């Protein structure tokens, strides 16, 4: 949450340490926030769409300057530059491409689906300008961290676990505040955290685990996977979850145990609800996504 002055950094924000100082003196001051584009301000209505786009493209211009400076200096080796622009704008403006989305009613009509098309035209132009800087033996790679689909409905997996008896709350509680504040771990078998992870409350791994590793854990994973796969949204009559994948069946390698016990695969239009992501338990399993972040 801190924007550290790149010219006089109070903390190391580049390697080597003087690189941010060099860039700021050469190109001017620049944003150093980890999440530079303020998507949450737009989500909460503190920032309107037009100034959000202005902010996002201002940051984009700074990253372009750094990229072309690095390309000009680097005669041998790799130059890597990450642009948040495509991610942020699509998260916040994908609703314009989905006429049935619940958040569309609050969206300014004048922005229209043209926002994302304009974004890709701009990025295509950037790729062309980078290619002009490359030599005959240079290789250009363009990569994305994920694709996009509409996020219409949220699924609170923790609420579902509570209703099914896999997650327990403290005496007298029917809901839990974020980060599982009111969860009774001594009688909880499973919990969900993040966008797609479901974890067993495993002995020896969780601080107050009750599920024994081995046969008990494997049987519980199989049961949860079976019950979650095809979970139906009574409002839309659609399957919200296409499959809950057992990590031992889809992952291999030395870091497999770092993954959630089950990976939840959501159907098109569905995602973990905002409350479920941060461990909130409430009375609602399914809900409309009314926020601007809908891609």
Language-model features, listed with the residues they occupy:
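Secreted, luminal/periplasmic, and some membrane-associated catalytic domains
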Residues: 1-29, 33-52, 108, 114, ...
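A conserved hydrophobic secondary-structure block that centers on an alpha-helix together
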Residues: 44-71, 86, 121, 128
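Active-site regions of oxyanion-processing enzymes, predominantly non-cytosolic
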Residues: 59-95, 264
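Alpha-helix boundary/interfacial micro-motifs
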Residues: 92, 99-101, 161-164, 170, ...
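A solvent-exposed, charged loop/short amphipathic helix patch at secondary-structure junctions
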Residues: 95-114, 283-286
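Short, cationic low-complexity segments
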Residues: 283-295
């Amino acid at each position: 949450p801190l924007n550290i002055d790149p010219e006089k950094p109070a903390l190391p924000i580049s390697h080597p340490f003087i690189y941010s100082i060099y860039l700021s003196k050469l190109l001017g001051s620049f944003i150093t926030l980890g999440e530079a584009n303020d998507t949450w301000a737009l989500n909460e209505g503190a920032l309107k769409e037009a100034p959000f786009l202005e902010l996002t493209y201002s940051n984009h211009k700074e990253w372009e300057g750094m990229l072309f400076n690095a390309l000009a200096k680097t005669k041998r080796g790799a130059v890597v530059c990450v642009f948040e622009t495509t991610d942020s704008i699509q998260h916040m403006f994908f609703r314009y491409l989905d006429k049935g989305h619940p958040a569309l009613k609050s969206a300014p009509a004048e922005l229209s689906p043209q926002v994302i098309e304009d974004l890709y035209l701009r990025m295509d132009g950037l790729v062309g300008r980078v290619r002009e800087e490359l030599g005959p033996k240079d290789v250009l790679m363009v990569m994305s961290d994920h694709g996009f689909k509409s996020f219409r409905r949220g699924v609170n997996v923790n609420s579902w676990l509570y209703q099914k008896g896999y997650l327990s709350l403290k005496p007298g509680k029917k809901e839990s505040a974020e980060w599982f504040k009111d969860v009774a771990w001594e009688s909880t078998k499973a919990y969900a955290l993040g966008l797609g992870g479901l974890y067993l409350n495993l002995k020896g791994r969780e601080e107050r685990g009750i599920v024994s590793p081995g046969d008990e854990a494997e049987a519980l994973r199989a049961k949860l996977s079976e019950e979650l796969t095809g979970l139906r949204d009574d409002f839309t009559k659609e399957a919200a979850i296409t499959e809950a994948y057992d990590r031992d069946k889809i992952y291999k390698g030395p870091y497999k145990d770092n993954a959630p016990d089950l990976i939840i695969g959501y159907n098109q239009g569905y995602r973990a609800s905002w409350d479920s992501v941060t461990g909130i338990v409430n009375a609602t399993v399914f809900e409309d996504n009314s926020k601007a972040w809908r891609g």
